[in-house]
Design a protein with these regions (language model features):
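Hydrophobic h-region of N-terminal signal peptides that target proteins for export
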Residues: 9-18
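Boundary/entry segment of secreted carbohydrate-active catalytic domains
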Residues: 19-43, 240-244, 304
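Hydrophobic faces of well-ordered beta-strands that scaffold small-molecule active sites
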Residues: 23-29, 55-57, 80-84, 149-152, ...
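Aromatic-lined substrate-binding rim segments of carbohydrate-active enzymes
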Residues: 43-47, 53-101, 211-235
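Substrate-binding cleft of secreted/luminal carbohydrate-active enzymes
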Residues: 267-278, 295-369
């Protein structure tokens, strides 16, 4: 009898040790106004079955949208975070044109946005901007079904584009150019002069003034940390999509995100944008994890929607990880300390992607030292 019990115990021990732990997986998703509750339920059930644990949902500014969709997501057993852009805001009766950022040529992001029409960035130095955002995120955080607020575009416009995007815009960004350098509005210029004694408009090459860079890092950091207080007062989490680094993030979009008081970070480790392979994903993840200590880092992975056309596709925004690369990208992320991954997006995943993904998420990854 004792021998039989010993065999049973050993069997369960061996079975338990053989079981592979599933890694946490979140995903960025856009809102579909046309879908019924039934259709959304089926979609979310399918994503849960495929291994998604949390949804970062972009549904606009209306709390009722998140109440409706959040209830469905929560009923499928997934986390529900609201993905709401921060500094990028289109025309809105609640926002005045003078609250938008101004570049080194004196052009407003409202009238003449950089790169693409939707790059209408607000200025983080304006108290009115903070009030608008605090009201927006505070109202959404009050929705019972919401687990957390997910910030995006919490930055300045790209003063330096990722290398893989240069050809798309016909640019060589080997230095900072004034038309992409923000913000030179009267408030920012006056506040910087008050704190440093320097009138930045009188400087021939502002990119050489480190205090001016730090001033703008701090503007974003202070705004984030104030918004954190708002969201935490509602007993909700707050996290953000950020550029890789934070070394690259600082140089490119003025994000010094290792100083942000968030509950988690979601760096967009989109290797194709940087003309890099999956090894780079691991290297940058290691930097990110080390920069924030014990704070969770979810490695954002950019998926190629049409793998068979990637080589012939000119637009890098249609590039991304191929099915045969996704396992390596996940492995590099997890072995270098990521708490999990975040997919951009489930809708870009092919059947071949899902097959490789399923194999990769049920593994015990050993952290690199």
């Amino acid at each position: 009898m004792h021998k039989f019990l010993t065999i049973i115990v050993l069997f369960f021990i061996l079975s338990s040790s053989a079981q592979k732990t599933k890694i946490p997986v979140h995903a960025w998703m856009g809102h579909s106004k046309e879908k019924t509750d039934k259709e959304l339920k089926e979609q979310f059930k399918d994503l849960k079955k495929k291994g998604i644990d949390g949804i970062m949902y972009n549904g606009g500014h209306d709390p009722e949208t998140y109440r409706r969709v959040g209830k469905i997501v929560k009923n499928t057993g997934m986390e529900f975070h609201t993905w709401v852009p921060t500094m990028v805001q289109g025309k809105n009766p609640k926002l005045k044109e003078e609250w938008y950022a101004v570049n080194g040529l004196g052009e407003s992001a409202f009238d003449k946005p950089a790169y693409v029409d939707h790059y209408k960035f607000l200025c983080p130095s304006r108290e009115e901007v903070y009030n608008f955002l605090a009201d927006l995120y505070g109202s959404i955080a009050e929705v019972e079904e919401v687990d957390g607020i997910h910030l995006d575009y919490i930055r300045f416009p790209d003063v330096i584009l990722a290398r893989g995007l240069w050809d798309k815009y016909g640019l060589v960004m080997d230095r900072e150019f004034p038309q992409f350098d923000y913000c030179y509005c009267d408030v920012c210029v006056a506040d910087f002069e008050a704190s440093s004694g320097v009138n930045i408009k009188e400087i021939k090459d502002p990119s050489q003034v480190e205090e001016w860079k730090q001033f703008r890092y701090d503007l974003i950091t202070d705004l984030v940390n104030r918004l954190t207080e708002v969201v935490h007062s509602k007993d909700k989490q707050i996290n953000a999509a950020v550029f890789p680094g934070p070394s690259d993030a600082k140089k490119m979009v003025r994000q010094e995100w290792n100083k942000w008081n968030l509950d988690a970070l979601y760096p967009m480790n989109y290797n194709d944008f940087y003309l890099e392979g999956t090894k780079w994903v691991g290297d940058i993840t290691k930097e990110e994890v080390m920069s924030v200590g014990d704070k969770p880092v979810f490695s954002g992975l950019f998926i190629c929607p049409n793998p068979e056309k990637k080589i012939s596709e000119a637009d890098p925004e249609n590039h991304g990880l191929l099915p045969e690369e996704i396992e390596a990208a996940i492995q590099e992320s997890m072995e270098n300390g990521a708490a999990g991954i975040c997919l951009f997006t489930p809708g870009r995943m092919t059947e071949a992607h899902w097959k490789a993904f399923n194999k990769a998420i049920y593994k015990n990854y050993k952290k690199n030292k």
